[in-house]
Amino acid sequence: MPAYRSKTSTAGRNMAGARSLWRATGMKDEDFSKPIIAVVNSFTQFVPGHVHLKDLGQLVAREIEAAGGVAKEFNTIAVDDGIAMGHDGMLYSLPSRDIIADSVEYMVNAHCADAMVCISNCDKITPGMLMAAMRLNIPVVFVSGGPMEAGKTRLANPVTKTIEFKKLDLVDAMVIAADDKYSDADVAEVERSACPTCGSCSGMFTANSMNCLTEALGLSLPGNGTVVATHADREQLFKRAGRRIVELARRYYEQDDERVLPRSVGFKAFENAMTLDIAMGGSTNTILHLLAIAQEAGIDFTMADIDRLSRVVPQLCKVAPNTNKYHIEDVHRAGGIMAILGELDRAGRLHTDAPTVHAPTLGDALAQWDITRTQDEAVRHFYMAGPAGIPTQVAFSQNTRWPSLDLDRAEGCIRSVEHAFSKEGGLAVLRGNIALDGCVVKTAGVDESIHVFEGTAHVTESQDEAVENILADKVKAGDIVIVRYEGPKGGPGMQEMLYPTSYIKSKGLGKACALLTDGRFSGGTSGLSIGHCSPEAAAGGAIGLVQNGDRIRIDIPNRTIDVLVSDEELARRRAEQDAKGWKPAKPRPRKVSAALKAYAKLVMSADKGAVRDLSLLDD
């Protein structure tokens, strides 16, 4: 029977000093026999996805204490990718994932906490906390702040001049701002309407993708990824998480039940999560994060597994930015993540024996929470929770219900396998002489007409140069924009490329151009945008050998990407580059701090999840 970790600092005569300090935090005699639960919050006023979390840690804490535990809250950092984007602030986003994981490890191990409730929401916070959970391997429940309501406005179509009702998100604000056909007044209207409430941005972007994947991993409660941040139903998720973690802690420490530990989800849960990701056309960043989380868990889940799954899993859900018809609030109305998992289960694509924090197995969870099979009216009522359309930064401030559920599996937001949006899923891994270790593309956002595309390389040595060239109309139809030395090591920090892809779209080149980078993309990206090219240029990857005018062929159906240059010519270029050193050909006015330089020294390429190369730390 494992001993409570907290006994290290609360039991025995020698710990009198530590207990004295614990008492100064409010603990009493009777508390020293209870599990100490860390409430890991990520409240910050910098991030709309986290601005409403301030009091929610104490909401969870009250439930923990009512269930017989001791709750102790602390905070991690949180970077807003949208605000950090388009300038050197984005260099810090991906590295912050590792800082978050480390900070959780430091606090939990330093104070010998027995279990955790992780209150996350946005892009790097959920994966950072998941990495920490796997590293620590103590009982954990995740609960997110929830998605933002989609924005809504009426806007004049710049071509037809008719007034159109439009659902909006952050990406619309970026695209319209770069489109000269819209007036300053139009841009201002969209800016004020695109992000109306607290919560993670309203499409299937990285934050929402990751919060949905925690459901498939079995580490959060049903609805975690989809019920909007403003809805009263989300309050119940926080309360249930607080009660549940005390039960899980007791099952592990008092009953020796290792199935409650996060690593017990095993390889099967990672396959389930990736299967869901492919089926819902999630952000390509999820690939990066799942690979990193699997490494922390000691699970051999690789790009090869992702490639294998991408060939057989259909796309069953299509949400912004891949369509302007649906947002996350619409996924919830259709039954949420449990409904997508239910359709995948009927297709034989899930491991339903994987454990969850709220049911013995995923199969048991689906029996209760899949709205197409449940007999529980409370579940159906839960999935009718909808947006109120009232701008607010207050959590749980409304109780609006959709008039009906979306149960249309032929033409609705969530489809059955027989009526899938596409037979192959929304993410794919490509390989070729330009990406020997692979690169990734969100096929859900690529028009079928350019699934096979051959174009001319337009080489840039940074995101800034790419943006400058696109806005100056130097990028033409048929070009493939190369953005290199933006990988984890070369950036450093692996910047997101949402601005260049948004500007390509605003220039009317969304179906006529491609972009290839060793950097990454925002979950808001769509179009033929191929990222995570590995090895990256700074690590000697062939993307660093491409020259202006080279022809490049992209073949998504056959999962290939090649620069159409002979092996002999590539070898000649490699020898030349080896002599010069693998650095950008043009100087970049970029401030790289000591912290970022330290990150660059240890980080590996994207195909390994951009995690640290721990072999470099061996004596």
Swiss-Prot record:
Binding site for Mg(2+): 81, 123-124, 496
Main enzyme class: lyase
Gene3D superfamilies xrefs: IlvD/EDD C-terminal domain-like
Textual note on the cofactor: Binds 1 [2Fe-2S] cluster per subunit. This cluster acts as a Lewis acid cofactor.
Single biological process term from Gene Ontology: isoleucine biosynthetic process
Residues at which [2Fe-2S] cluster binds: 122, 201
Cofactor: [2Fe-2S] cluster; Mg(2+)
A GO MF term: 2 iron, 2 sulfur cluster binding
Claim: Thylakoid is one of the keywords in the record: no
Pathway: Amino-acid biosynthesis; L-isoleucine biosynthesis; L-isoleucine from 2-oxobutanoate: step 3/4; Amino-acid biosynthesis; L-valine biosynthesis; L-valine from pyruvate: step 3/4
Residues modified as N6-carboxylysine: 124
UniProt keyword annotations, A-Z: 2Fe-2S, Amino-acid biosynthesis, Branched-chain amino acid biosynthesis, Iron, Iron-sulfur, Lyase, Magnesium, Metal-binding
Record has Amino-acid biosynthesis as a keyword: yes
Catalytic center residues: 522 (proton acceptor)
Catalytic activity: (2R)-2,3-dihydroxy-3-methylbutanoate = 3-methyl-2-oxobutanoate + H2O; (2R,3R)-2,3-dihydroxy-3-methylpentanoate = (S)-3-methyl-2-oxopentanoate + H2O
A GO cellular component entry from the record: cytosol
Domain of life: Bacteria
Subunit relationships: Homodimer.
Entry function: Functions in the biosynthesis of branched-chain amino acids. Catalyzes the dehydration of (2R,3R)-2,3-dihydroxy-3-methylpentanoate (2,3-dihydroxy-3-methylvalerate) into 2-oxo-3-methylpentanoate (2-oxo-3-methylvalerate) and of (2R)-2,3-dihydroxy-3-methylbutanoate (2,3-dihydroxyisovalerate) into 2-oxo-3-methylbutanoate (2-oxoisovalerate), the penultimate precursor to L-isoleucine and L-valine, respectively.
Cited HAMAP family: IlvD
Family (UniProt): Belongs to the IlvD/Edd family.
Protein name, UniProt field: Dihydroxy-acid dehydratase
Species annotation: Paracidovorax citrulli (strain AAC00-1)
